[in-house]
């Protein structure tokens, strides 16, 4: 692999980060009629996390200076105080409204383990969005070995591994009842690790000789590629709305977005001169 790209390469991804945020916000504003926004935006964020963390920590990982627990505590300091404050507010609001405090829900929220139980009573309890923090924390804990495994594998081994993952994942898509989608495929930490690993694998490709050459070719025809990506983005949105009632939620809620997330993040990392 080539040497690490400058950090300014991450700037191109910011546009898609903003797009993902907009999708998630719209899903909460509109409600169930725009579930597409939350499902796709969350997928983009998980894949993006794998890619961005790999790029930002590339040198530390290569030199052995990356320390998992120091990294995890650094990340916790960023969001845990606000989470604790929000949780306190909601618990007090529920108590003030006459609802008894559910100490089981409170404890799982404080420990960020609510998504491990696949329970509709726990996953979105109190601070509903904290389920994402639970899953991303799991990724932080396993980031170093996952990165080492994916970056260090041969292309053949990596392809075979991904085939095995898809083969193992597919039965869950067909067997899990659709009404349990939100508490299993959508939020269970081990399932969402797949999204994050896609981001790491994408980073591996971007840093490879093939990825560099493709990025250079795209940069030479920046406006053409921008137009193509915008067309794909529009087609992506239109196709989803046209077929959302046909596709089962277990498929369209997560894995449907994987190829689109990879495409958009790769195009952002190309850092076109015209952007």
Range-by-range predicted roles:
Residues 1-174, 179-180, 221-223, 227, ...:
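Membrane-cytosol interface segments of multi-pass membrane proteins
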Residues 35-44, 181-190, 247-255:
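Non-cytosolic membrane-interface motifs at loop->transmembrane helix junctions
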Residues 43-49, 112, 135-139, 191-199, ...:
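Hydrophobic core segments of transmembrane alpha-helices in multi-pass, intramembrane catalytic enzymes
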Residues 52-56, 136, 140-144, 148, ...:
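Transmembrane alpha-helices and membrane-interface helical segments
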Residues 99-101, 176-184, 212-214, 244-248:
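Membrane-interface helix termini and inter-helical loops of multi-pass transporters
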Residues 196, 200, 224-275:
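Alpha-helical transmembrane segments of multi-pass integral membrane proteins
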Residues 210-216, 271-275:
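Alpha-helical transmembrane segments
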């Amino acid at each position: 692999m080539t040497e690490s790209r400058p950090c300014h390469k991450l700037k191109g991804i910011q546009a898609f980060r903003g797009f993902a945020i907009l999708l998630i916000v719209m899903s909460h504003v509109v409600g169930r009629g725009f579930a597409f926004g939350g499902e796709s935006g969350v997928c983009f964020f998980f894949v993006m996390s794998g890619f961005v963390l790999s790029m930002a920590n590339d040198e530390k990982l290569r030199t052995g200076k990356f320390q998992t627990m120091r990294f995890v505590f650094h990340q916790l300091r960023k969001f845990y105080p606000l989470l604790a404050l929000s949780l306190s507010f909601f618990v007090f609001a529920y108590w003030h409204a006459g609802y008894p405090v559910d100490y089981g829900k409170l404890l799982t929220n404080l420990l960020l383990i609510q998504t491990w139980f696949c329970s509709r009573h726990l996953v979105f309890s109190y601070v509903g969005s904290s389920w994402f923090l639970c899953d991303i924390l799991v990724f932080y804990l396993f980031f170093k070995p996952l990165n080492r495994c994916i970056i260090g594998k041969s292309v053949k081994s990596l392809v075979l591994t991904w085939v095995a993952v898809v083969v193992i994942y597919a039965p869950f898509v067909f067997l899990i009842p659709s009404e349990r989608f939100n508490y299993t495929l959508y939020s269970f930490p081990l399932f969402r690790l797949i999204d994050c690993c896609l981001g790491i694998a994408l980073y591996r490709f971007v840093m490879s000789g093939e990825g560099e050459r493709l990025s250079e070719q795209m940069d030479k025809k920046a406006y053409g590629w921008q137009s193509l990506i915008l067309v794909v983005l529009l087609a992506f949105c239109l196709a989803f709305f046209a077929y959302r009632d046909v596709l089962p939620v277990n498929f369209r809620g997560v894995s449907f977005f994987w190829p689109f997330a990879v495409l958009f993040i790769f195009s952002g990392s190309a850092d076109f001169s015209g952007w």
